[in-house]
Amino acid sequence: MIDLENSTEFEIDTLNLENIANTLTTKDIELIVVKNDEIQELNKEYRNIDKPTDVLSFPMNFEVIDMPLLGSIVISTDFVQEKAKEFKHSFNEEFTLLFIHGLLHLLGFDHEIDNGEHRLKEEELIEKFKLPSSLIVRNS
């Protein structure tokens, strides 16, 4: 299940996101939708990077047995709008790409240190759900 916290004016359709999440996990996901100023604060606090970013993931501690929550994904709608326009696809498609990217981080994938597994899993999901190329795929 996706627990949506949306502090923006954008309508977020969680049905497709639920379908994607359910192919990878049975755990719950907290999805927080914000603007650049809010994600910048989080980026500074947790990564010591004082600028906005597109998506952040906060996995739960797996030492807790049977924890129903996988973690939290935070997405900036400002980035979604910008990239959707730049790459000529819909807001919903770009949002879904960022959701997939964040979800894979919650599941332990890390494109910054792995041998391409994160990119390959993203490509698999992009193809399965008929989405345009994601940032990680566009940059490879």
From Swiss-Prot:
List, alphabetically, the Pfam families matched.
Answer: YbeY
Q: Which UniProt keywords apply?
A: Cytoplasm, Endonuclease, Hydrolase, Metal-binding, Nuclease, Ribosome biogenesis, rRNA processing, Zinc
| The organism's place on the tree of life at top rank | Bacteria
Q: Which GO terms describe its molecular function?
A: metalloendopeptidase activity; RNA endonuclease activity; zinc ion binding
Q: Chief localization class?
A: cytoplasm
* Comment on bound cofactor: Binds 1 zinc ion.
* Matching PROSITE patterns: UPF0054 (PS01306)
GO cellular component terms, alphabetically, are:
cytoplasm
Extent of the signal sequence = none
NCBIfam families in the cross-refs = rRNA maturation RNase YbeY
Q: What is this protein called?
A: Endoribonuclease YbeY
Instruction: Record the organism.
Output: Aliarcobacter butzleri (strain RM4018) (Arcobacter butzleri)
Q: Which taxonomic lineage does the organism of this UniProt entry have?
A: Bacteria, Pseudomonadati, Campylobacterota, Epsilonproteobacteria, Campylobacterales
